Amino acid sequence: MRFKGLDLNLLVALDALMTKRSVTAAARSINLSQPAMSSAIARLRSYFQDELFRMQGRELITTPRAEALAPAIRDALLHIQFSIISWDMFNPAQSDRCFRIILSDFMTLVFFEKVVERVAREAPGVSFELLPPDDNPDELLRRGEVDFLIFPDVFMSSVHPKAKLFDQTLVSVGCLTNEQLLGDLSFERYMSMGHVAAQFGRALKPSVEQWLLLEHGYKRRIELVVPGFNLIPPLLSGTKRIAIIPLRLANHFAKSIPLRIVKHPLPLLSFTEAVQWPALHNKDQASIWMREILLDEAARIAAPRETAGCLGR
């Protein structure tokens, strides 16, 4: 199929090359032989009058022209996929859809395992690829490379639609034997203690509690940085350090780790967990179904109010 002299199939090949950055992987992803992909590259070069790609060792290097074309081509293909092709009725029981979702280790533990259990019952062919927080999640959404982000809403852009899941309360935690946590924790003692904090991605982006503290003008003495919330409670054991984590996570680990949960002396720290999806997925039947599952399971979690009854363990 040609449009103004361009074989539209070549756009699919160009998108695969820009996504995979490998001729072999790109050819495999769109079911082309390597000779057929090499032919497509030659035709793309001829049409656009640009080299587009060159090999440097085993790495595929793209030209500025290829980089400029990539977003428009990706957007066009996604628009076709979700506005024209995906209008078939979605049957969860028969679907083999794989959802790619970016979320934290903590949300996987306290929330998403319930989603997995439910989907296994209602749609046994549906699968998930859960990904750690990325340095540029908005770009992955725009390119349709992930189906959902599950993040604190303060970290979400206004470009794509989102929905609230539930609110989170933050608490201070330390080892059960940490005598500095006995009685009321003063602001001075809190700020003098060594802290454990989570940071994410190659850029070591701050976690939500660190962002909230900085917004309030507080800077802690961080002595240990870990790549996820779930590592914090075990690494507090046997130390005098303290950390701020979501209450749901603290309650989860307090069942198996000698953990003391205390009220922190700072202004009430809380945030909202939300789910975000690409704007082009708004009317995609599979995405709609998955969003309903996420919101329904979030409502079940939010129903029992978090209380301070466990504080001061």
From Swiss-Prot:
DNA-binding span(s): 23-42
Function: NodD regulates the expression of the nodABCFE genes which encode other nodulation proteins. NodD is also a negative regulator of its own expression. Binds flavonoids as inducers.
Superkingdom of the organism of origin: Bacteria
Protein name stated in the entry: Nodulation protein D 3
Any one GO molecular function term: DNA binding
Recorded family membership: Belongs to the LysR transcriptional regulatory family.
Keyword terms of this UniProt record: Activator, DNA-binding, Nodulation, Plasmid, Repressor, Transcription, Transcription regulation
Residues spanning the signal sequence: none
Source species taxonomy: Bacteria, Pseudomonadati, Pseudomonadota, Alphaproteobacteria, Hyphomicrobiales
CDD domains in UniProt: PBP2_NodD
Pfam family membership, one: HTH_1
Keyword Chaperone part of the UniProt annotation: no
Miscellaneous comment text of the record: There are at least three nodD genes in R.meliloti. They differ in their specificity of interaction with different flavonoids and, consequently, contribute to the nodulation of various plant host species to different extents.
HTH lysR-type domain sequence ranges: 6-63
